[in-house]
């Protein structure tokens, strides 16, 4: 799976979780960019990521995610071993 494909899938998950059409996730997207972001929606997003990409997100990874690029980096490592 390429990074572009990961961004596309992540964007779909964000749109679903935050119920926002047209939301685009980039390397610089952060919680501050999404008014609907709460601790509960974040946990729902993590669950959706786990289901979509087929791995369990570790707490240390969750805590390191500050921007979309951080998420993609973790997903890329887990999915592609990179």
Give, region by region, the residue ranges found by the protein language model.
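Phosphopantetheine-dependent thiolation modules in NRPS/PKS and related acyl-activating systems
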Residues: 2-47, 51-82
């Amino acid at each position: 799976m390429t990074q572009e494909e990961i961004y596309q899938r992540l964007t779909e998950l964000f749109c679903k979780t935050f119920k926002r059409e047209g939301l685009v996730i980039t390397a610089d997207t952060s919680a501050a960019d999404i008014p609907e972001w709460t601790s509960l929606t974040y946990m729902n997003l993590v669950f959706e990521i786990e289901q979509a990409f087929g791995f369990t997100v570790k707490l240390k990874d969750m805590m390191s995610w500050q921007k979309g690029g951080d998420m993609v980096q973790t997903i890329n490592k887990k999915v592609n071993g990179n």
